[in-house]
A protein has these predicted regions:
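Single conserved hydrophobic/aromatic residue that forms the stacking wall/gate
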Residues: 1-8, 12-13
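Glycine-biased, small-residue-rich flexible motifs in mid-sequence functional cores and linkers
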Residues: 20-245
């Protein structure tokens, strides 16, 4: 049952662009992804696949962050890039895009996981970022060619964002934010989850404070992520995390 789909995938990739692919039985398939639930059998990519083997932090957060959230994201992405951590995001608008753009000012150690075909990009305003990362960085997807994005794929790619990371950082989120779905995947995969606290008077962005109450590791400085990296993950209660988009 696997081989026909693999053959079909090979035909797709041969008929498309310069994208490459690896499979679950290939020597260069990311070891971290082999450890997650339901790893993609075929992984398509543009760029430097060896980045998945380096120390890394997945950055997630609001699609429409506040000025505070934007500044926090820029600060942490900047400092982590200077520490040679690979920055990983799903390339969504907002926090994810801000983190990638800031990190690329320092380093080419950036990874984006797409919810669409490897030869496309999402959201559409990230065309220049996509093209830059294909040359300097890494773009990966479990979908071939220009397959259009679907609602369930937006959620599914978060398991890969978390899966290839060593830890997950949320810089700013709303209450019951859909970005909390990555927390569920991180817990399932045994990854540490870090959250930057928001102001108690900011009623629009209490999501991170809620995560901290549930057991996420609070960070108030970029160096906290490195200093606390050996702490075992806490038993977050993810029963309240909505897995539906």
């Amino acid at each position: 049952e696997i081989m026909p789909s693999l053959v079909g995938s090979e035909m797709c990739i041969r008929d498309s662009s310069s994208a490459k692919f690896t499979t679950l039985v290939s020597d260069n398939y990311p070891a971290k992804l082999k450890e997650i639930s339901c790893p993609p059998f075929v992984l398509y990519y543009h760029g430097n696949l060896s980045l998945v083997d380096k120390k890394s932090v997945a950055v997630a957060g609001s699609l429409k962050p506040s000025e505070y959230g934007k500044k926090c994201t820029e600060l942490y992405a900047d400092e982590l890039a200077k520490k040679e951590d690979v920055i990983i995001t799903g390339m969504q608008e907002g926090v994810a895009t801000i983190a990638l753009k800031q990190a690329m000012k320092i380093s080419d150690k950036v990874i984006a996981v797409l919810p669409c075909g490897i030869d496309s990009y999402y959201p559409k305003q990230n065309k220049e970022l996509y093209e830059a990362m294909c040359k300097n960085g890494l773009i990966i997807s479990e979908y071939p060619r220009k397959l259009e994005v679907k609602k369930d794929q937006i959620v599914q790619r978060l398991r890969l964002v978390s899966g290839i990371s060593d830890k997950v950082l949320l810089t700013e989120t709303e209450t019951k934010s859909k970005q909390h779905i990555i927390v569920s995947y991180a817990l399932e995969q045994g990854k540490n989850v870090y959250a930057i606290p928001s102001g108690v008077m900011d009623k629009d962005f209490q999501g991170n404070n809620d995560l901290i109450k549930m057991g996420a590791i609070i960070v108030t400085s970029p160096k906290d992520i490195t200093d606390l990296s050996d702490i075992d993950i806490k038993d977050l209660d993810n029963s309240e995390i909505d897995m539906e988009m």
